[in-house]
From Swiss-Prot:
Modified residues (N-acetylalanine): 2
Organism: Ovis aries (Sheep)
Pfam families (UniProt xref): Keratin_B2
Sequence repeats mapped onto the chain: 27-36, 37-46, 47-56, 57-66, 67-76
Function, in words: The keratin products of mammalian epidermal derivatives such as wool and hair consist of microfibrils embedded in a rigid matrix of other proteins. The matrix proteins include the high-sulfur and high-tyrosine keratins, having molecular weights of 6-20 kDa, whereas the microfibrils contain the larger, low-sulfur keratins (40-56 kDa).
Highest classification ranks of the organism: Eukaryota, Metazoa, Chordata, Craniata, Vertebrata
Gene Ontology cellular-component terms listed: cytosol; keratin filament
Protein's UniProt name: Keratin, high-sulfur matrix protein, B2A
Length: 172
């Protein structure tokens, strides 16, 4: 039976044998689809126990977990913490900007299966950061790094990931 162990920014990854905390791990740890019914999800394989509905506060909000850049409805409350939070100071005026929690679907990053979570940023993340965060493309923005890898950069499009040899952001 698949099990989860903590790795890569604290998120669970799939392994075999052992336990997850004090409970046996469930095969749903390795689920790859995003919008699964909450009845088959287990708290054992979730990063936080209250994140059990794949960023969908209610059953009628079914598009929140789809790979779209601008779908924000329901995401602020679906990932465990509602509202926005302060994000330091901007410029010399001392104005405080506001970070918003954007939903990110389930995807593979650095060869690791990650459950759905939220990207916290001041502006809407690009699809590259939000959905196509892959080792060969962009760094995972939810780990505090939003710049692209030097090898290639995904274009911020919701249709298909397009990689180019040059990076849109050469430095972090």
């Amino acid at each position: 039976m698949a099990c989860c162990s903590t790795s890569f920014c604290g998120f669970p990854i799939c392994s075999t044998g052992g336990t997850c905390g004090s409970s046996p791990c469930q095969p749903t740890c390795c689920q790859t689809s995003c919008c699964q019914p909450t009845s088959i999800q287990t708290s054992c394989c979730q990063p936080i126990s209250i994140q059990t509905s794949c960023c969908q506060p209610t059953s009628i909000q079914t598009s929140c977990c789809q790979p779209t850049c601008l779908q924000t409805s329901g995401c602020e409350t679906g990932c465990g913490i509602g509202g926005s939070i302060g994000y330091g100071q901007v410029g010399s005026s001392g104005a405080v900007s506001s970070r918003t929690r954007w939903c990110r679907p389930d995807c593979r990053v650095e060869g690791t299966s990650l459950p759905p979570c939220c990207v916290v940023s001041c502006t809407p993340p690009s699809c590259c950061q939000l959905y196509y965060a892959q080792a060969s493309c962009c760094r995972p923005s939810y780990c505090g790094q939003s710049c692209c890898r030097p090898a290639c950069c995904c274009q911020p499009t919701c249709i298909e990931p397009i990689c180019e040899p040059s990076c849109c952001e050469p430095t972090c």
